[in-house]
Amino acid sequence: MTSHQPRRSESVVSFAEARDLVSKHRSPLLVLSRSKLAQSYRTIRDHLPGVGIYYAAKANAHALVLETLQSLGASIDVCSIKEMQGAFDAGFIPSQMIHTHPCKTESNLSTCYENGVRWFVFDNEFELDKFVTFAPESNLLLRVSMTSRSSALNLSSKFGASPNQSLAMLSAARRKGLRPHGLSFHIGSQCLDPSDFGHALRSMRGLINEAIAAGIPLEVLDIGGGFPAPYRDQELMPMADYLDIVHACLTETFGDLPIRLIAEPGRAVCAESITLISSIVGKSFREGTRWYFLDDGLYGAFSGKRPGHTDYQLLVERQGQLDQERFDCVIAGPTCDSGDVLYRDFPLPEMEIGELVLAPTMGAYSLASACEFNGMAIPQMIAID
């Protein structure tokens, strides 16, 4: 039965569990709930019937995540040799893969092709010349530029052929002896309004009709991802309800056309399954303002704040104590970079060094973009179930 409760950012561990885990593994620590990951994947699969689900490895390519999804029968979207190798290590096979990077190095393309990957994406004629030389028997999807009013991040500002170029690009592929099989688009990251898919799908149907009329039969449509996850102070509709609207748009637009549909969700699959456990390692008063320094910051798991415009929820154990006075505080990361500041004017009660801070919904675009700046270790990840 579908729940109609709003989705909120919730931790996969309690503070008692977090303390126990930190005593064994130290912090910062990313904690994966495999059962939550499986639940998210199954919700997407079950509410997009007839749509092939290719998990976007770029969101989180950790072995624990990939192995769990492979065991559930997922397929996978890769963009590089390393992502392909990680997929192989997790048990995926080439027929379960699609390579969706529109701009590939010759090494990236040829190595993935030589290892059996056959589905690729392109968005310009120069990219087609690489396929002629290095991957001539590939099955190609043309990436088309599409945007959404409610997406947090426009993913068509860098990639995607304009719709009015689509027929010319498909024709160019045919002239070069290549095999264009369909279209792809990405509506943008963290798309909050599922009805935005309706406009994009109607546009894609028009392009497919145009191609068919020109003698280029297209048999695949990749609708990308963009399905959202709940972050700080957000209440989103249940994912099942969101996907039901997307599926209704698909049925309305393509119900009369025999076409293979696929999607590439990343954030919606993995975000809510992981919580970061961090510790306060420093405290100071600067011009009357409380500063708290965590053992993880913008160069670690919080790196997702930069590319995804993501505002993570922070939970402290004292938050539930109604008699606690709260202060507008600065929350900073551990590095020497003065820009490594997570929040300003963040309301917190008086905190002490050693106390834990939980950051839920940390599964997507966090570990994936972390680095060891200043020699600070990237948070390790463990699974709790």
Regions found by a protein language model. Give the residues of each.
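A charged N-terminal "starter" segment
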Residues: 1-138, 175, 179, 213, ...
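Active-site loop/helix belt of alpha/beta enzymes
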Residues: 146-283, 348, 374
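Conserved, mostly hydrophobic/aromatic
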Residues: 37, 58, 80, 112, ...
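Charged (often Lys/Glu-rich) extended helix/loop segments that serve as interaction or gating elements
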Residues: 245, 257-385
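Flexible loop/turn segments at secondary-structure boundaries
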Residues: 61-64, 86, 149-150, 189-193, ...
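Active-site-proximal loop/turn and secondary-structure-junction residues that shape catalytic pockets
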Residues: 36, 59-61, 82, 103-104, ...
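Short acidic, glycine/serine/threonine-rich loops at helix termini
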Residues: 66, 89, 109-114, 131-134, ...
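Structural preference for beta-strand elements that scaffold enzyme active sites
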Residues: 52-54, 73-75, 94-98, 119, ...
